[in-house]
Amino acid sequence: ADVRNPLEEFRETDYEVL
């Protein structure tokens, strides 16, 4: 999922960038 669309597909790997 894209960090700009967290509701698209929640993965801790996406939020790891934040």
UniProtKB/Swiss-Prot annotation:
Enzyme Commission code(s) on record: 1.4.3.2
Cofactor: FAD
Gene Ontology BP terms: apoptotic process; defense response to bacterium; killing of cells of another organism
GO CC annotation, single: extracellular region
Compartments, record wording: Secreted
Key word Oxidoreductase present: yes
MF term (GO), any: L-phenylalaine oxidase activity
Keywords: Antibiotic, Antimicrobial, Apoptosis, Cytolysis, Disulfide bond, FAD, Flavoprotein, Glycoprotein, Hemolysis, Hemorrhagic toxin, Hemostasis impairing toxin, Oxidoreductase, Platelet aggregation activating toxin, Secreted, Toxin
Post-translational modifications reported in the UniProt record: Contains 2 disulfide bonds. N-glycosylated. The enzymatic activity is not affected by deglycosylation.
Tissues/organs with expression: Expressed by the venom gland.
Catalytic activity field: an L-alpha-amino acid + O2 + H2O = a 2-oxocarboxylate + H2O2 + NH4(+); L-leucine + O2 + H2O = 4-methyl-2-oxopentanoate + H2O2 + NH4(+); L-phenylalanine + O2 + H2O = 3-phenylpyruvate + H2O2 + NH4(+); L-methionine + O2 + H2O = 4-methylsulfanyl-2-oxobutanoate + H2O2 + NH4(+)
Glycoprotein in keyword set: yes
Subunit relationships: Homodimer; non-covalently linked.
Function per UniProt: Catalyzes an oxidative deamination of predominantly hydrophobic and aromatic L-amino acids, thus producing hydrogen peroxide that may contribute to the diverse toxic effects of this enzyme. Is highly active on L-Phe > L-Tyr > L-Met > L-Leu, and is weakly or not active on other amino acids. Exhibits diverse biological activities, such as slight hemorrhage, induction of platelet aggregation, edema in the mouse paw and bactericidal activity against both Gram-positive (S.aureus) and Gram-negative (E.coli) bacteria.
Family from the record: Belongs to the flavin monoamine oxidase family. FIG1 subfamily.
Name the record gives this protein: L-amino-acid oxidase
Lineage: Eukaryota, Metazoa, Chordata, Craniata, Vertebrata
